[in-house]
A protein has these predicted regions:
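Glycine-rich phosphate- or other oxyanion-binding loops that anchor nucleotides, phosphorylated ligands
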Residues: 65-163
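N-terminal short beta-loop-beta anion/metal-coordinating cradle
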Residues: 1-89
Length: 167
């Protein structure tokens, strides 16, 4: 296997899609959200990504055979909005692998002319919270203001993981 193998399952044309990433992480929040989106929208799997940066594990399929860990990209299109949805089994097991895989994810985004990327993930604070909220980070003041209009909160000096590398 190559360091990263990208298998294109189907070619699709999208118009300046928005990319949404939800990989396993704290509480599997991002993964659960995008899996729900994929199911509700009937998004179509178009890419499989394999890498030796994923844990050396296999998953047992319904028929009893196994498959390697992988991440996947789904596409969905409507007259008003096109989406690319990135999800999968694992994140990288190394710090270096996070950056290498992120570069490939961004290559995919560039190939499709992605207009914006949102990454989703949980935020561990060490205890249960009474009131849930959405905490964000962005790469421009304009995007911060736009997200604030939707109730997203921003916290100074907070660390972030892979879900923030993509932004």
């Amino acid at each position: 296997m190559k360091e990263i193998e990208i298998r294109e399952l189907k070619r699709v044309k999208l118009n300046a899609p928005v990319m949404i990433e939800g990989l396993p992480g704290v509480g599997n929040v991002g993964k659960l959200v995008v899996e729900h989106m994929i199911e509700e929208l009937h998004a179509e799997k178009i890419i499989e990504i394999y890498s030796w940066h994923f844990p050396p594990q296999v998953f047992v399929k319904d028929d009893g055979t196994v498959r390697l860990c992988r991440n996947e990209v789904y596409a969905w299109s409507s007259p008003k909005l096109d989406l690319l949805i990135l999800t999968g089994d694992q994140q990288s097991i190394t710090n270096e692998g996070h950056y290498i895989l992120t570069e490939k994810y961004l290559d995919i985004a560039e190939k499709f002319g992605v207009s914006r990327i949102f990454t989703l993930g949980g935020y561990g604070i060490g205890h249960l919270v009474e009131e849930q909220r959405v905490i964000g980070a962005a790469n421009s003041p304009e995007l911060v203001e736009e997200m604030r209009r939707f109730g997203v909160e921003f916290m100074e000096e907070e660390p972030g993981g892979l879900s923030l590398i993509h932004i």
